[in-house]
């Protein structure tokens, strides 16, 4: 299978919209698109799945072992004719030490790069910008550009003339279009499941990409993908794991679910927002992250969900929550307006969005004991909640940031119930 990376000089350049339009346009031509997302982001993959019709794997060169990156590519190759990978941030932006950039991923997987350039405030300077990106690393090939937010025919002509001077192919030109802007909130884009006209948006993006880009040239730029054998992932929480899944609990990595199934575990889903109970046969329940703060009142009134979670925990099932799921396992959640909502009360924890503080970055976590996990792991943390109070319970992890700074202990465990703000990704070497 061949692959491409859709990257940009910076965030906000329009690469998500271009990626969605490209996936849908190529899918309409009969191609089987394998979607991918660089980095730890949960939100973009749901849009990719909507555009491509296929599950989207994350590829994170900082947090994932090289063998897992190659294994994810192999899994994608089994069910796709071309991999379309969306980068994160700028092409060469990574963790604090510079590692883990999309460029590292392009080099590791052999992906040609198409650079999406926001040209709203550029003309001839585009050549210096693109030329610098093309020459920055010998092991990363910028195959061409898509010029986004171009204002007029005259503007397009200046841009094309400038890029002709450095022999950089222009695969497409997209004019400024207010209808091609996705709504955002504090953790990124508004989720795909909450976008009231998502299909219409993707169809419009596909129409603009198909009419403004040379799709044959885009496909011709794709390069053979470097793949590997299957790699081990984090162990499943249980033999039969019930996973919360709705707009309040949507942040769950596809490589983990796929890895759990590959290890023989059964995965079922339920919706706390619909007041559903986890599978009563489950020996583990997983509450992933999401936006419980936006649905706190509804969750506090979900009596069937609450009773079933207490029954599962009381019956010995391993219950684990990450970030938003961790907050729901606590006793209460204080919303941004100061109103408090009662949560499950399975952990002695009260969290608040009334006192906001951003927590963001890669983490290396080591379990304090082996009740839930063994060995060091990589993780990512991104939230605005603060801990108002914390009662007596065992700590779950010791934590270091990407630079190795000791962040102390984090998370809580009370018998067979545990959680933390960290989104676990892979084993740490």
Curated annotation (Swiss-Prot):
Pathway: Cofactor biosynthesis; adenosylcobalamin biosynthesis; cob(II)yrinate a,c-diamide from precorrin-2 (aerobic route): step 9/10. The active site is at 323 (nucleophile). Gene3D superfamilies: 3.40.50.880, P-loop containing nucleotide triphosphate hydrolases. It holds the Pfam family CbiA. InterPro entries: CbiA/CobB_synth, Class_I_gatase-like, CobQ/CobB/MinD/ParA_Nub-bd_dom, GATase_3, P-loop_NTPase. GO terms for biological process: cobalamin biosynthetic process. Residues 240-429 form the GATase cobBQ-type domain. It is an enzyme of class 6 (ligase). GO terms for molecular function: ATP binding; cobyrinic acid a,c-diamide synthase activity; hydrogenobyrinic acid a,c-diamide synthase (glutamine-hydrolysing) activity. It catalyses: hydrogenobyrinate + 2 L-glutamine + 2 ATP + 2 H2O = hydrogenobyrinate a,c-diamide + 2 L-glutamate + 2 ADP + 2 phosphate + 2 H(+). The record marks 423 as: Increases nucleophilicity of active site Cys. Its EC number is 6.3.5.9. Keywords: ATP-binding, Cobalamin biosynthesis, Glutamine amidotransferase, Ligase, Magnesium, Nucleotide-binding. Its cofactor is Mg(2+). Comprises of two domains. The C-terminal domain contains the binding site for glutamine and catalyzes the hydrolysis of this substrate to glutamate and ammonia. The N-terminal domain is anticipated to bind ATP and hydrogenobyrinate and catalyzes the ultimate synthesis of the diamide product. The ammonia produced via the glutaminase domain is probably translocated to the adjacent domain via a molecular tunnel, where it reacts with an activated intermediate. The a and c carboxylates of hydrogenobyrinate are activated for nucleophilic attack via formation of a phosphorylated intermediate by ATP. CobB catalyzes first the amidation of the c-carboxylate, and then that of the a-carboxylate. Belongs to the CobB/CbiA family. Catalyzes the ATP-dependent amidation of the two carboxylate groups at positions a and c of hydrogenobyrinate, using either L-glutamine or ammonia as the nitrogen source. This is Hydrogenobyrinate a,c-diamide synthase.
């Amino acid at each position: 299978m061949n692959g491409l990376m859709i990257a940009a000089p910076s965030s906000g350049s329009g690469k998500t919209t271009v990626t969605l339009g490209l996936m849908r346009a190529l899918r309409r031509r009969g191609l089987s698109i394998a979607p991918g997302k660089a980095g730890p982001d949960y939100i973009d993959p749901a849009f990719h799945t909507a555009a491509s019709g296929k599950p989207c794997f994350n590829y994170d060169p900082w947090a994932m072992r090289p063998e897992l990156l190659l294994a994810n590519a192999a899994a994608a190759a089994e069910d796709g004719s071309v991999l379309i990978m969306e980068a994160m941030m700028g092409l060469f932006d990574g963790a604090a030490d510079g590692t883990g950039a999309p460029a590292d991923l392009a080099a590791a997987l052999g992906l040609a790069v198409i650079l999406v350039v926001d040209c709203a405030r550029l003309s001839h300077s585009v050549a210096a910008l693109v030329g610098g990106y093309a020459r920055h690393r010998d092991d990363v090939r910028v195959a061409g550009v898509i010029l986004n937010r171009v204002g007029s025919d005259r503007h397009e002509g200046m841009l094309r003339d400038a890029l002709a001077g450095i022999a950089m192919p222009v695969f497409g030109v997209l004019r400024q279009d207010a209808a091609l802007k996705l709504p955002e909130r504090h953790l990124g884009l508004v989720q795909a499941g909450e976008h009231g006209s998502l299909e219409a948006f993707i169809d419009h993006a596909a129409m603009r990409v198909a009419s403004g880009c040379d799709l044959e040239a885009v496909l011709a730029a794709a390069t053979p993908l470097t793949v590997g054998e299957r790699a081990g992932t984090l162990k499943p929480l249980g033999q039969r794991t019930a996973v919360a899944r709705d707009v309040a609990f949507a942040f769950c990595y596809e490589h983990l679910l796929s890895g759990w199934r590959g290890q023989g575990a059964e995965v079922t889903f339920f919706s706390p927002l619909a007041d559903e109970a986890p599978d009563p046969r489950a020996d583990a329940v997983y509450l992933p992250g999401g936006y419980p703060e936006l649905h706190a009142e509804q969750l506090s009134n979900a009596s069937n969900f609450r009773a079933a979670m207490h029954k599962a925990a009381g019956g010995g099932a391993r219950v684990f929550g990450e970030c938003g799921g961790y907050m729901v396992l606590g006793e209460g959640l204080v919303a941004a307006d100061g109103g408090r909502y009662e949560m499950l009360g399975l952990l002695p924890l009260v969290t608040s969005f009334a006192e906001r503080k951003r927590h963001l970055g890669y983490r290396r976590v080591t379990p304090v004991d082996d009740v839930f996990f063994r060995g060091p792991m990589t993780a990512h943390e991104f939230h605005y909640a603060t801990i108002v109070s914390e009662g007596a319970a065992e700590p779950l992890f010791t934590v270091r940031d990407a630079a190795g700074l000791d962040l102390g202990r984090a998370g809580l465990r009370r018998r067979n119930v545990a959680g933390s703000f960290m989104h676990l990704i892979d084993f740490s070497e």
